[in-house]
Amino acid sequence: QKPFENQTKARQDSLIAHAKRGQNSLFSSPIYSDRYLSFLVDELKPFVDERYATATTPEHTFIGGSSMGGLISLYALTEYPEVFGGAACLSTHWIGTFESTANTFPGLYLRYLEERLPKPGTHKLYYDYGTVGLDSLYEPYQLKVDELMNKLGYDDRNWLSRKFEGAEHSERSWKARLSTPLKFLLN
């Protein structure tokens, strides 16, 4: 939500108008990322922690998702680093929109990450992408995120980025490789 809100009002209005014309469903309705995270952190997690024997500290609390779920998982880690100790971001939808021109979303999100990622050594981050279909669009953006991770001082103890040749943007592909982020985060 905050990367979108960091755009100029004119750019936000342009994306919303574009979406309302049916050309981009991503911004066709209000953005409720912060409300969703508030629900997870303030309602769901306390409910689960109260009713089940859980380890409640950040080093035992992870979040993950695929595609836009990868973006919101990373957003959750940056907004609530005191809650989440790691994030698994599979086939992260770095492109945001499908606009071929003037797509400012990737740059805005990268800037947001540079400002908000927790210090290296305190959290674990996992990213991946495939090479088929929609996933084939992600590599240049993931490489920029990888550069940022290096620049910020993350290393192989707290960051892993993987490319899966032949993997597509699908539940089947994510299921086939889910053990990789789980082993990394839980190790």
Model regions: which residues?
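Non-catalytic cap/lid and distal C-terminal segments of serine-dependent acyl enzymes
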Residues: Q1-N187
